[in-house]
Amino acid sequence: MEKISVSAFLLLVALSYTLARDTTVKPAAKKDTKDSRPKLPQTLSRGWGDQLIWTQTYEEALYKSKTSNKPLMIIHHLDECPHSQALKKVFAENKEIQKLAEQFVLLNLVYETTDKHLSPDGQYVPRIMFVDPSLTVRADITGRYSNRLYAYEPTDTALLLDNMKKALKLLKTEL
C-alpha cells in the first residue's frame, strides 16, 4: 500500500511540474508574436476608412440617416474572417469608394442586430446592406451571388460602387 501511495504521489508531482512548466513557457513564446505588440486603440472605423465618420450603434445610425436625409450603409463583418479582412483592405484603399462613402451614414458591425430585415437571406459575413432615410431596408440592392445576396468579394468593387450610386440615386428620386 505504501508503494502505491509513494508512486501516486510521485506521479502527481511529475504531472504538476509538467503542467506548471507548460504554462510558464507559453507567455515567453508569445513575446515573439504580433500579439505582444501594443495594440492601437480601436476606432469606430475598425480599419474600413479612418477618415470617414462612423456611427457606433444601429439605432444611432438610423437616427442620423433619418435626420440628415442620407442613406445608411451597413457593413457586417468579423475581425477574424479572412473574407472580411480582404474586403476591408480593398474598401479602405479604394479612393473612389472612400469618397462616395462620405455621402452615407456609415456603420460597421461585428455582431448581428435584432432587426431581422438586415439578414433576409441569412447571417453571413461580409455583408453590405443599405437603408434609406425613410428607414426602409433596400433589399433590392444586391451583390452578384444568388445564395448570398448582400455579399461582396474584393473583386466586386465596381459592383459595390454601382450599388452605392444606386442607393444615392434612388434616394433622390424617391423623395
Swiss-Prot record:
Family statement drawn from the similarity comment of this UniProt entry: Belongs to the AGR family.
Positions of the UniProt region annotated as Required to promote cell adhesion: 21-40
GO molecular-function term, one example from the UniProt record: identical protein binding
Family annotation (PANTHER family): ANTERIOR GRADIENT PROTEIN 2 HOMOLOG, ANTERIOR GRADIENT PROTEIN-RELATED
GO BP field: mucus secretion; positive regulation of cell-substrate adhesion
Gene for this chain: AGR2
CDD domains: AGR
Record's subunit section: Monomer and homodimer. Interacts with LYPD3 and DAG1 (alphaDAG1). Interacts with MUC2; disulfide-linked.
Keywords: Disulfide bond, Endoplasmic reticulum, Proto-oncogene, Secreted, Signal
Signal peptide range in chain numbering: 1-20
Locus of motif Homodimer stabilization: 45-54, 60-67
One GO cellular component term: endoplasmic reticulum
Species the sequence originates in: Pongo abelii
Name of protein: Anterior gradient protein 2 homolog
Protein localization: Secreted; Endoplasmic reticulum
Function: Required for MUC2 post-transcriptional synthesis and secretion. May play a role in the production of mucus by intestinal cells. Proto-oncogene that may play a role in cell migration, cell differentiation and cell growth. Promotes cell adhesion.
